[in-house]
Amino acid sequence: MSDNTVKIKKQTIDPTLTLEDVKKQLIEKGKKEGHLSHEEIAEKLQNFDIDSDQMDDFFDQLNDNDISLVNEKDSSDTDEKLNPSDLSAPPGVKINDPVRMYLKEIGRVNLLSAQEEIELAKRIEQGDEVAKSRLAEANLRLVVSIAKRYVGRGMLFLDLIQEGNMGLIKAVEKFDFNKGFKFSTYATWWIRQAITRAIADQARTIRIPVHMVETINKLIRVQRQLLQDLGRDPAPEEIGEEMDLPAEKVREVLKIAQEPVSLETPIGEEDDSHLGDFIEDQEAQSPSDHAAYELLKEQLEDVLDTLTDREENVLRLRFGLDDGRTRTLEEVGKVFGVTRERIRQIEAKALRKLRHPSRSKRLKDFMD
């Protein structure tokens, strides 16, 4: 890599670490640097199913250690900074009427000052539902700003906003202003968690666990960075080196990341064909086999016509030539009202006739 290239940070997660171990690591890092970012917290905790109480306990620990939360890992982060006042749509997103109306509506809501935020939080403690609504409405822009980061992950922009709003509501209910965090700092975690979980649950035809979605997203970022650095598609070994993963694990993640393709996908310039039209049905007969089978049936019918009616019918029942179900000697005997031994004799005589060269040569070509 050239000197001008930003080295991709390796964020490895030891699967043997417990939740408390990871929290301890984060707190030690926060003490050393004075802050932690929402991104690195989310990345480190992605493999654990954390409930709201556990997350609140962690925020308490951060507060007790004077560790602040920031929205970006560092100044070299290429992600767009969160800007709650920016209500424009992200690049590539078509603004339809519902989205435009929603953005216009929340744009009319005034942002809160720090003092107003505290006053609302105090009222919420007293069970004031109006204060809850006011705090949530004032932070709807924050949800839009965060939702922009997840466009292109398989969910519509408006759906991302809706899921983020659910996280915002949870943050409003759990927020404790006495801990010293700004509400936006606290809410960012819950909004992001709600959106990422929704993407994992809804964005794919086949559901992928949240922690695997995060791994896939990280792998894609590494893959894109290496593509820029190397000028070619990176090998699994090169991706694995950046992520501290075995090449085999990288291949497994890449395989999981593949999206199913619909058999109804249009094919061709006129979109008059579908992908399913070009996929062979492994269980269906090939045209050549079908043609050979039909010819064999015709020849077999001609050969059977040379037998007596009783001989022909006995063979049809014994070998299931009409319905595919073979019968025992006893079953055929009951049909004709004779003994099983008599049926055996009729069958043997009929087969001897079929073995005669005058008849067998007509079927011999189908025996190859």
From Swiss-Prot:
GO terms for cellular component: cytoplasm. The keyword Metal-binding does not apply. InterPro entries: RNA_pol_sigma-70_dom, RNA_pol_sigma70, RNA_pol_sigma70_r1_2, RNA_pol_sigma70_r2, RNA_pol_sigma70_r3, RNA_pol_sigma70_r4, RNA_pol_sigma_70_r1_1, RNA_pol_sigma_70_r1_1_sf. GO terms for molecular function: DNA binding; sigma factor activity. Residues 303-356 are annotated as: Sigma-70 factor domain-4. GO terms for biological process: DNA-templated transcription initiation. Pfam families: Sigma70_r1_1 (PF03979), Sigma70_r1_2 (PF00140), Sigma70_r2 (PF04542), Sigma70_r3 (PF04539), Sigma70_r4 (PF04545). It is found in: Cytoplasm. Residues 71-83 have a biased composition (Basic and acidic residues). Its main location: cytoplasm. Residues 214-290 are annotated as: Sigma-70 factor domain-3. Gene3D superfamilies: RNA Polymerase Primary Sigma Factor, Sigma-70 factor, region 1.1, Winged helix-like DNA-binding domain superfamily/Winged helix DNA-binding domain. Residues 329-348 bind DNA. The keyword Metal-binding does not apply. A motif (Interaction with polymerase core subunit RpoC) lies at residues 159-162. Sigma factors are initiation factors that promote the attachment of RNA polymerase to specific initiation sites and are then released. This sigma factor is the primary sigma factor during exponential growth. Interacts transiently with the RNA polymerase catalytic core. This is RNA polymerase sigma factor SigA. It comes from Staphylococcus aureus (strain N315). The gene is sigA.
